[in-house]
Swiss-Prot record:
It comes from Drosophila melanogaster (Fruit fly). This is Anamorsin homolog. GO terms for biological process: iron-sulfur cluster assembly; negative regulation of apoptotic process. Residues 209-223 are annotated as: Fe-S binding site B. GO terms for cellular component: cytoplasm; cytosol; mitochondrial intermembrane space. A motif (Cx2C motif 1) lies at residues 209-212. [4Fe-4S] cluster binds at residues 209, 212, 220, 223. The lineage of its organism: Eukaryota, Metazoa, Ecdysozoa, Arthropoda, Hexapoda. [2Fe-2S] cluster binds at residues 172, 181, 184, 186. It comes from the Eukaryota.
Length: 248
């Protein structure tokens, strides 16, 4: 028991009273502290406070449900020492580990030692990863005014802002102009003729309510502009040929 030197308060759990005083004196000499006595059969009725002892020694006893209680009775980093135990060492070591002890080991063929963790049961500790990183916090303090943003208008030239003329989108592949050649075979002649006929048909199309340009919500049920987007007053809008023909 030289490893227990300096432990101030110990509990000796006994089963046989023969030479009990001698064993207690040996434990006092090894630890240099006070030793309390408790009978193994009275252990379940005892009312020791938690974290009361630095060392608990059990001699010639087999415990099944009391290791957890002994764990609470020990101070953090306190030691449990079993001498002349009953049963296989491997089974006892596993039972002690499952009760919450650590560093369980077999010191000799008839002695086992275990330790209580260095913290009290139910205690808490602050985790390091919960600390806020100062640099990460400062990121949210960056002002948007410090960022140099590109003006979207500077990305466009004056030519980009001009709308293309629909009349000049398609030209003849031969003349390079929007005018069909004599023997047109690209379809431009038919397209120009269709536009011409449509223009003639829609020249006399007038609004009877004056709200056609506002959109479908303001148009009557027979409005020829139904389905078309809103347009500016006086803006020329080309209607399809089938909208000017009677359904009957």
């Amino acid at each position: 028991m030289e490893n227990f030197k300096g432990l101030q308060k110990s509990l000796y759990i006994w089963t046989d009273s023969a030479d009990l005083d001698k064993r207690v004196e040996q434990l006092k000499a090894a630890t240099g502290g006070d030793v309390a006595l408790e009978n193994v059969h009275r252990l379940s009725f005892s009312s020791y406070a938690n974290s009361s002892f630095d060392l608990i020694v059990i001699e010639c006893a087999q415990l099944t449900d009391s290791y957890v209680k002994l764990l609470h009775m020990l101070k953090p980093s306190g030691k449990l020492h079993l001498v002349s135990y009953i049963g296989p060492a491997a089974s006892l070591l596993q039972e002690i580990k499952l009760s919450g002890f650590i560093n369980c080991r077999e010191d000799s063929p008839d002695a086992l030692t275990a330790e209580k963790p260095g913290y009290e049961t139910g205690s808490s500790a602050r985790l390091s990863f919960a600390k806020k990183n100062a640099s990460a916090v400062n990121v949210w303090k960056i002002s948007g005014d410090d960022e140099e943003l590109i003006d979207e208008e500077e990305l466009l030239d004056e030519e980009d802002k001009q709308k293309p003329d629909p009349a000049g989108l398609r030209v003849c592949s031969t003349t390079g102009k929007r005018k069909a050649c004599k023997n047109c075979s690209c379809g431009l002649a038919e397209e120009l003729e269709t536009e011409k006929q449509s223009q003639k048909a829609t020249e006399n199309a007038k609004s009877s309510c004056g709200n056609c340009y506002l959109g479908d919500a303001f148009r009557c049920s027979t409005c020829p502009y139904l389905g078309m987007p809103a347009f500016k007053p006086g803006e020329k809008v080309q209607l399809a040929d089938n909208l000017l023909k009677s359904d009957i």
